[in-house]
Amino acid sequence: MALYEHMFLARQDVAPQQVDELLSLYKGVIETHGGKVGRVENWGLRPLAYRIRKNRKAYYVLVNIDAPAAAIAEMERQMRINEDILRYMTIRVEKHEKEKSAMLSHLDRNAHAGQDEERSRSPRRQRENAIERVE
């Protein structure tokens, strides 16, 4: 069996639970045809570089797959039919990456930076309030 990285973009109107349902549907297709789904990264709702079918945002999902070519062909066929899928892309790879993708690492880093920013702002506000009280 070959190793693949597969990414799909789901419409912005779709609820996050429906994205998970789409993912489980395509996992079922892969497993039915004798493949295995590895790591799954849901990047959430992100802006698109350009509009696709009147959508400015989409849910991004990255999946590592170990499956025969027939399983990939069937999954892509079903994605073509589904109106909730805006785009998909499957790439054959030599090996799967063990660590998180660069995009997910970037999202995590930004999330932590946002928390640090909030922490650094709150003492400043407290100091400013304390200074106002003293005067």
Swiss-Prot record:
What's an example GO cellular component term for this entry?
A: cytosolic small ribosomal subunit
The lineage's top-level taxon is: Bacteria
> Which residue ranges does UniProt annotate as crossing the membrane?
none
This molecule's function is given as: Binds together with bS18 to 16S ribosomal RNA.
Q: Which gene encodes it?
A: rpsF
Q: Where is this region: Disordered?
A: 99-135
Protein name (Swiss-Prot/TrEMBL): Small ribosomal subunit protein bS6
Q: Single Gene Ontology BP term?
A: translation
Pfam family for this entry, one: Ribosomal_S6
